[in-house]
Amino acid sequence: QIGDNCSIGSNVVIRNSLIKNNVHILDGCVIGKKGFGFFPDKVSNFRYPQIGIVIIDDNVEIGCGSTIDRGSLSNTIIGKNTYLDNQIHIAHNVKIGENCIIAGQVGFAGSSTLGNNVMIGGQAGISGHLKIGSNVQIGGGSGVIKSIPDNSKVMGYPAKDLKKFIRENK
């Protein structure tokens, strides 16, 4: 289902999704396909069921070449007024809050949650099953491997408090 006043670019694939109003999806995006999740076994690997959907709330823009996986057992959600730059990957069950700005080539592993008003610089990576609080800023190229509390500014690999990062890298 696609809401009112939406635009869909060329070569976009949309499946298993609910797209609300004023959403703009630029060229080459793939939204709602199954995510990457397996039960490892000594003989073979078995895929997790992928039965959730992608929900994209009002006033969202998704840049060229971005991919958003459907949820496995819950939904993948993009909150209102969020802007995703080009070539972003959002894995299954990720929940992004409202008013977020995410720069190009950011990757989210499965089941992480972002609060509201989060800004993430380009080429940052967010590991799976983390909670990123509201009003957080993550510097470009950072590797986030643990949860981040509200109102934090972090940078580096592994991501650490911005003031500490600056002191250590003078």
Report residues per predicted region.
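Structural signal for interior beta-strand "rungs" in well-ordered beta-sheet cores
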Residues: 1-161
